[in-house]
């Protein structure tokens, strides 16, 4: 790698990178990937600034060659690449002359045209994740962030990319070339995997002074210093030590081991109460899409442009009215919010140029729906510790809910095939090893089985919505931004298609911690009449907003079109996981792989081809009251994927607890089926731990009912 860096980069850049590594006490012979990363970052900073000048009229211009005597000033001041002292001197001087706020961390550039510092990032990972890490580290709205990736993606604060398209394309092309060059020398994989997240200030925080003395004083006996204790903890092997202690204790441990027989286990007790309601962040089987095929309009790919184009495909709008009110909400406000969206979209269409983003007017209905000014005022604890009756809020116990049939229907629907493909077959280069060949063959077979699955649509929809909401939450903290809910797919004929499910309006989003909540209002199109299963839609206000003509066996029929509106909320950490929903594909592929591996080890040859191509064979899919359900290998793939996707969509503490505790009972039952004569103690306590997670969550209740079917059939 070191040789490659010296060949690939300008000697001046290499020299600066060597200096930087020396300054931080790093050895470039060992940290070769870091050496390459520093050179790449330096080169991007220089390319960013190259050819950009400000003329005597204060206009930003691009000059690649020309009159050396022209009165031109460099548009960007380069801070990156200078030694720390010099760099801070430059920053201080800029702050003094321009009045800019002094940044906490050294930025990379200063833009004299926009009067702002710029932090440049080059990442081998997802641009969104790296952007968030940068934003979390800098914690300043004044410093502009611009991230490039080696795959040609980029992300910048408020989607303001500073430079013209051509200058940015030069940078992306260079990064792509570096990647290709590395790959051809077999260096890329190691380089890609070596990227660490942004170091937070804590990692480099040396404990000194009083805190250090306190740390040294609070060590367990027999440890002289914090370093000693750390070294001991890092090298501690717990097992032998704990076993020794347990054998000394066994006289005092009073656990009677009871045999676990077929008659021992009882079914789980599911709660009684009103039926459970829908709690996903967006509609699933009930969603309706307004779509455009082969999009080629101006601004294609910009969400707002796409949304307006999709809205224009529908002509059946009518005066909206509430058909299913939200019991606790102010329903006229939801109605007004939808009317406001329609009116503001109409305003945009009347403008000459459609903007890239749309911030909604802060009307009373939106303030109410987004909970503006509703949070109780925070008071410093020191100011109120003398208050005699200081106590936490009384929070009500959650109301118990019973299992409703709709969640099983949702799951069945998620396993079905749609008539569109939601993921592309990844184009990866030629396989160079037999194991790679088998892996890519498995991936291709699996992709073919799940690419049209509705659960895959939910993945892409979830990734899009969470990415868009997280971007808007970082870039437009104070604005009520309108975010279209969009997905993209290909039709059977291979034509591209852009779909609009509805809109989200984001509330204020000053998200400092991972768990800070951003409120949003979702408005989603549907043809489902909410009056058929009102319990499912408890959290929604549903409007009737139009009539849609549908083709049917008897010709065209008109069906009312509904809008499902609700207030909801999410957090940075939930959005981060939402953005990574593609992992569900990987998880289910790994489960299928373990089935293939088991089959292959019995037959002593790779069974991938036979596994996917033998259409006559059926495989167990799951338990139902009727017994073990079986289906084709494709159905198994789609069912496993749907389970993984629902675990993500309905993630909750109840699910975490139920999964962890029910697994223990499952292992005991499996041991009994394998004639291993298992014994248990405190089985009642285990049932209690499982059943305390069965409260009101639809997905957990469905899993518990499946678990009961499994118990019934497993112990016959």
Swiss-Prot record:
Its EC number is 3.1.-.-. Binds 2 manganese ions per subunit. Phosphorylated on serines and threonines by host kinases, including human casein kinase II. One of its GO terms (biological process) is symbiont-mediated suppression of host mRNA transcription via inhibition of RNA polymerase II activity. Keywords: Cap snatching, Endonuclease, Eukaryotic host gene expression shutoff by virus, Eukaryotic host transcription shutoff by virus, Host cytoplasm, Host gene expression shutoff by virus, Host nucleus, Host-virus interaction, Hydrolase, Inhibition of host RNA polymerase II by virus, Manganese, Metal-binding, Nuclease, Phosphoprotein. Influenza RNA polymerase is composed of three subunits: PB1, PB2 and PA. Interacts (via C-terminus) with PB1 (via N-terminus). Transmembrane segments: none annotated. One of its GO terms (molecular function) is metal ion binding. GO terms for cellular component: host cell cytoplasm; host cell nucleus. This is Polymerase acidic protein. Mn(2+) 2 binds at residues 80, 108. A motif (Nuclear localization signal 2 (NLS2)) lies at residues 184-247. Mn(2+) 1 binds at residues 41, 108, 119-120. It comes from Influenza A virus (strain A/Brevig Mission/1/1918 H1N1). The keyword RNA-binding does not apply. Gene3D superfamilies: Influenza RNA-dependent RNA polymerase subunit PA, endonuclease domain (3.40.91.90). South Carolina isolate has been sequenced from formalid fixed-lung tissues of a 21-year-old male which died in 1918 at Ft. Jackson, SC. Brevig Mission isolate has been sequenced from lung tissues of an Inuit woman buried in the permafrost in a gravesite near Brevig Mission, Alaska. This sample was recovered by John Hultin, retired pathologist. Belongs to the influenza viruses PA family. The gene is PA.
């Amino acid at each position: 790698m070191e040789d490659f860096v010296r060949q690939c980069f300008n000697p001046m850049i290499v020299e600066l990178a060597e200096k930087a590594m020396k300054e931080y006490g790093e050895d470039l012979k060992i940290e070769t990937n870091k050496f390459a990363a520093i050179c790449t970052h330096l080169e991007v900073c220089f390319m960013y600034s190259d050819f950009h000048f400000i003329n005597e009229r204060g206009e930003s211009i691009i000059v690649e060659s020309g009159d050396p005597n022209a009165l031109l000033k460099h548009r960007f001041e380069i801070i990156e690449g200078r030694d720390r002292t010099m760099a801070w001197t430059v920053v201080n001087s800029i702050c003094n002359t321009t009045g800019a706020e002094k940044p906490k961390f050294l930025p990379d550039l200063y833009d004299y045209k926009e009067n702002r510092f710029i932090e440049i990032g080059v990442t081998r990972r997802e641009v969104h994740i790296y952007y968030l890490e940068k934003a979390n580290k800098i914690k300043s709205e004044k410093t502009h962030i611009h991230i490039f990736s080696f795959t040609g993606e980029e992300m910048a604060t408020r989607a303001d990319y500073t430079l013209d398209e051509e200058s940015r394309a030069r940078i992306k092309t260079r990064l792509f070339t570096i990647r290709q060059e590395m790959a051809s020398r077999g260096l890329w994989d190691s380089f890609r995997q070596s990227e660490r997240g942004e170091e937070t200030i804590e990692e480099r925080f040396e404990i000194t002074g009083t805190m250090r003395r306190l740390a040294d004083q609070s060590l367990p006996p027999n440890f002289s210093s914090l370093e000693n204790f750390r070294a001991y903890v890092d090298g501690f092997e717990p097992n032998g030590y704990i076993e020794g202690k347990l054998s000394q204790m066994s006289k005092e441990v009073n656990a009677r081991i009871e045999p676990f027989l077929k008659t021992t286990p009882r079914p789980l007790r599911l709660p009684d109460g009103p039926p459970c309601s829908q709690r996903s962040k967006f509609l699933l089987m009930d969603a309706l899409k307004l779509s455009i095929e082969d999009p080629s309009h101006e601004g294609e790919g910009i969400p707002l442009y796409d949304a307006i184009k999709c809205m224009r495909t529908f002509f059946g709008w009518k005066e909206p009215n509430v058909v299913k009110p939200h019991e606790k909400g102010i329903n006229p406000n939801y109605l007004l919010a939808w009317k406001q969206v329609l009116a503001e979209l109409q305003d945009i269409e009347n403008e000459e140029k459609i903007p890239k983003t749309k911030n909604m007017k802060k009307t009373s209905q939106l303030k109410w729906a987004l909970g503006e000014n509703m949070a109780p005022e925070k008071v410093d604890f020191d100011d109120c510790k003398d208050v005699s009756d200081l106590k936490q809020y009384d929070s009500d116990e959650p109301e118990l809910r019973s299992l409703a049939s709709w969640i099983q229907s949702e799951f069945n629907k998620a396993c079905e095939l749609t008539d569109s493909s939601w993921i592309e077959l990844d184009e990866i280069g030629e396989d160079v090893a037999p194991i790679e060949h088998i892996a890519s063959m498995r991936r291709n077979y699996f992709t073919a089985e799940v690419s049209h699955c509705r659960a895959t649509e939910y993945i892409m929809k979830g990734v899009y919505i969470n990415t868009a909401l997280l971007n808007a939450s970082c870039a437009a903290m104070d604005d009520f931004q309108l975010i279209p809910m969009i997905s993209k797919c290909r039709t059977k004929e291979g034509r591209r298609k852009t779909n609009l499910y509805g809109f989200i309006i984001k509330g204020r989003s000053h998200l400092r911690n991972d768990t800070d909540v951003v409120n949003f209002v979702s408005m989603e199109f549907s043809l489902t009449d909410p009056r058929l299963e009102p319990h499912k839609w408890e959290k929604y206000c549903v409007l009737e907003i139009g009539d849609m003509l549908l083709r049917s066996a008897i010709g065209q029929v008109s069906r009312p079109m509904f809008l499902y509106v609700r207030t909801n909320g999410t957090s940075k950490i939930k959005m981060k996981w939402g953005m990574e929903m593609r992992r569900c594909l990987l998880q289910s592929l790994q489960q299928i792989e373990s089935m293939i591996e088991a089959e292959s080890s019995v037959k002593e040859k790779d069974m991938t081809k036979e596994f996917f191509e033998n259409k006559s064979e059926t495989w167990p899919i799951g338990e139902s009251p009727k017994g073990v359900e079986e289906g084709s290998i494709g159905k198994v793939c789609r069912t496993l994927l749907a389970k993984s996707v629902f675990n993500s969509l309905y993630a909750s503490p109840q699910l975490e607890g139920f999964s962890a505790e029910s697994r223990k009972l499952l292992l005991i039952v499996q041991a009994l089926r394998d004639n291993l004569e298992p014994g248990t103690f405190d089985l009642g306590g285990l049932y209690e731990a499982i059943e305390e997670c069965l409260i009101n969550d639809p997905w957990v209740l469905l899993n518990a009912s499946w678990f009961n079917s499994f118990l019934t059939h497993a112990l016959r």
